[in-house]
């Protein structure tokens, strides 16, 4: 599973998820990508479940790129613990994903296989998603 090797602070503020992603909106490595349509935290377990779903469906072919990483820790207090007495212990790691961010990319397989693999992965994630195709750069242009 994905976890940071080391962090400066074990406990972080929750933060805000306002607006769309600043970068990572285009498919850069593969031919197809899975784009988030809403902002959310995605845990390292959800990322791993999506990766396993894609790679199992594709069998031995193709390549998967994971474009998000769980840098942020989240905390939780035990069940039945009263309010107060400090912040809880770190419970896991999440990736902060804003809308329009490409989370996964697939290359080296046919369009049907890529679309089905990304569809299976989308069911493992807590956000609405859409499958996007790579924009070909430097092709025919009908500008002046």
Swiss-Prot record:
InterPro entries: Ribosomal_uL16, Ribosomal_uL16_bact-type, Ribosomal_uL16_CS, Ribosomal_uL16_dom, Ribosomal_uL16_sf. It comes from the Bacteria. SUPFAM superfamilies: Ribosomal protein L16p/L10e. Keywords: Ribonucleoprotein, Ribosomal protein, RNA-binding, rRNA-binding, tRNA-binding. GO terms for cellular component: cytosolic large ribosomal subunit. One of its GO terms (biological process) is translation. GO terms for molecular function: rRNA binding; structural constituent of ribosome; tRNA binding. Binds 23S rRNA and is also seen to make contacts with the A and possibly P site tRNAs. Part of the 50S ribosomal subunit. NCBIfam families: rplP_bact. Belongs to the universal ribosomal protein uL16 family. This is Large ribosomal subunit protein uL16. It comes from Latilactobacillus sakei subsp. sakei (strain 23K) (Lactobacillus sakei subsp. sakei). The gene is rplP.
């Amino acid at each position: 599973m994905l976890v940071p090797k080391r962090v400066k602070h074990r406990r972080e503020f929750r933060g805000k998820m306002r607006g769309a992603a600043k970068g990572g909106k285009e498919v850069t490595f593969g031919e197809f990508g899975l784009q988030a349509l809403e902002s959310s935290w995605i845990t390292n377990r959800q990322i791993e479940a999506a990766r396993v779903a894609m790679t199992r469906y594709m069998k031995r072919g193709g390549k998967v790129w994971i474009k998000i990483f769980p840098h942020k820790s989240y905390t939780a207090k035990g069940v039945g613990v009263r309010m107060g007495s400090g912040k809880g212990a770190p419970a896991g790691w999440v990736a902060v994903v804003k809308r329009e961010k490409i989370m996964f990319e697939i290359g080296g397989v046919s369009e049907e296989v890529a679309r089905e693999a990304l569809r299976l992965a989308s069911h493992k994630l807590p956000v609405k998603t859409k499958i996007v195709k790579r924009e070909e750069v430097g092709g025919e242009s009908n500008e002046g």
